[in-house]
């Protein structure tokens, strides 16, 4: 029996290698997927083999994650509950797909992951695996073994599994698009998040940053005039924007599994690019298009967060989003100061803005007769209804 395990290199999945091997008398094959996290994958591979992995795979999926997931998040202004740019939620389907590919290659239908029974990730992993692999048999050790962190450490020591035993206050998950932070005082929503929880947005530069981002059909392609591939562009903004303290999210989040959770994220590039993209949309779209697009964005964000990446409606929403984004091209100028970002200018060949029409100093003015006629017709529904109801 072979079991393919989605392996992060952390305590849970390291213990899972040995636990799966002992519990199911199985050959465990570990798979690590690089979606831009700042990990030492050589050490992760060594740790997997020391824990008992029969074979280890490392899959480089950074470019695919950037192009097929992060860029979609920009085009759809993907912010769950209007604040969270979905970094973890976007990565899980791709990781599951890569793990499923290894399972097919190894000729097994048994796949394992390290998600717990109270997290969102179990939903995302399970649904993605069920989509990617026919007749998949999913094993989630953390949903079965009921071990605490201390139990896991003791289990590892008893079996000679080398692990880092020093206690970390925070549980971290990161990829190219963002970093999530959990644990310790963060669990108390009344307490301020300590500065030592932040890494990407720890203030390292005090100077004001001005930069421009150019979009083509809703996709960022240049920063300060330099054409960059998506991975480099996102990485650059994570550093330049994050080093000035911008990119933090803290809120009470409504989880898929039925309760509220205090969540803290860092996503400098994601938040900067979505802010710029939304501003450019506002520059080129009609009021009705904007209203419609905001509805698309909200629904798309909910589907992704809730693990419904393979829901057919997502494709429909993206088709509509792509049609609208055909006109979202231009340049947005940003200013990043200490822990803040604002749009300071924008241009687009598709902007209907006319200074001749909008300026109060010169140009077009409706006549008194035109203004009176417009106002009379514009307010007629309200005026007639109010008169009918209240006299």
Curated annotation (Swiss-Prot):
E.C. number: 6.3.4.5
Entry's localization field: Cytoplasm
GO cellular component, one term: cytoplasm
Keyword field contains Amino-acid biosynthesis: yes
Keyword Cytoplasm set for record: yes
Primary location class: cytoplasm
A GO biological-process term: argininosuccinate metabolic process
Keywords: Amino-acid biosynthesis, Arginine biosynthesis, ATP-binding, Cytoplasm, Ligase, Nucleotide-binding
InterPro entries: Arginosuc_syn_C, Arginosuc_syn_N, Arginosuc_synth, Arginosuc_synth_CS, Arginosuc_synth_type_1_subfam, AS_cat/multimer_dom_body, Rossmann-like_a/b/a_fold
Pathway: Amino-acid biosynthesis; L-arginine biosynthesis; L-arginine from L-ornithine and carbamoyl phosphate: step 2/3
Binding site for ATP: 6-14, 114
Positions bound to L-citrulline: 84, 120, 124, 171, 180, 253, 265
Recorded coiled-coil stretches: none
Gene Ontology MF annotations: argininosuccinate synthase activity; ATP binding
Pfam family, one: Arginosuc_syn_C
Binding site for L-aspartate: 116, 120-121
Reaction catalyzed: L-citrulline + L-aspartate + ATP = 2-(N(omega)-L-arginino)succinate + AMP + diphosphate + H(+)
NCBIfam families per UniProt: argG, PRK00509.1
HAMAP family linked to this entry: Arg_succ_synth_type1
Subunit note: Homotetramer.
Protein name: Argininosuccinate synthase
Taxonomic source organism: Metallosphaera sedula (strain ATCC 51363 / DSM 5348 / JCM 9185 / NBRC 15509 / TH2)
């Amino acid at each position: 029996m072979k079991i393919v395990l989605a392996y992060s290199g952390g305590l849970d999945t390291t213990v899972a290698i040995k636990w799966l091997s002992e519990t199911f008398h199985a050959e465990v094959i570990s798979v690590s997927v690089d979606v831009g996290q700042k990990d030492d994958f050589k050490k992760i591979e060594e740790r997997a083999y020391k824990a008992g992995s029969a074979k280890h795979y490392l899959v480089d999926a950074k470019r695919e994650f950037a192009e097929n997931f992060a860029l979609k998040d920009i085009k759809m202004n993907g912010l769950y509950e209007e604040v969270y740019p979905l970094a973890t939620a976007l990565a899980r389907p791709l990781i599951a797909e890569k793990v499923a590919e290894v399972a097919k290659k190894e000729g097994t239908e048994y796949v394992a992951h390290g998600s717990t029974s109270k997290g969102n990730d179990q939903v995302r992993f399970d649904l993605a695996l069920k989509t990617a692999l026919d007749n998949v048999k999913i094993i989630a050790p953390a949903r079965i073994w009921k071990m605490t962190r201390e139990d896991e450490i003791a289990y590892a020591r008893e079996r000679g599994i080398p692990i880092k035993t020093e206690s970390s206050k925070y549980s971290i998950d990161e990829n190219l698009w963002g970093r999530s932070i959990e644990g310790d005082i963060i669990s108390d929503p009344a307490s301020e998040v300590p500065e030592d929880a932040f890494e990407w947005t720890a203030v390292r530069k005090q100077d004001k940053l001005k930069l421009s981002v150019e979009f083509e059909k809703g996709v960022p392609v240049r920063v300060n005039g330099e054409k960059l591939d998506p991975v480099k562009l996102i990485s650059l903004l994570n550093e330049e924007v994050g080093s000035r303290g911008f990119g933090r999210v803290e809120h009470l989040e409504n989880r898929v599994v039925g309760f509220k959770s205090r969540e803290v994220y860092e996503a400098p590039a994601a938040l900067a690019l979505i802010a710029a993209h939304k501003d450019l949309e506002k520059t080129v779209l009609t009021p009705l298009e904007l209203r419609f697009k905001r509805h698309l964005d909200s629904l798309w964000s909910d589907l992704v967060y809730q693990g419904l990446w393979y829901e057919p409606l997502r494709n429909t929403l993206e088709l509509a989003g792509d049609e609208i984004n055909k006109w979202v091209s231009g340049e947005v100028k940003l200013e990043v100061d200490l822990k803040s970002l604002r749009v300071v200018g924008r241009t687009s060949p598709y902007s209907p803005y006319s200074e001749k029409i909008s300026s109060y100093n010169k140009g077009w003015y409706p006549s008194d007769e035109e203004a009176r006629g417009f106002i009379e017709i514009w307010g007629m529904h309200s005026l007639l209804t109010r008169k009918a109801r209240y006299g």
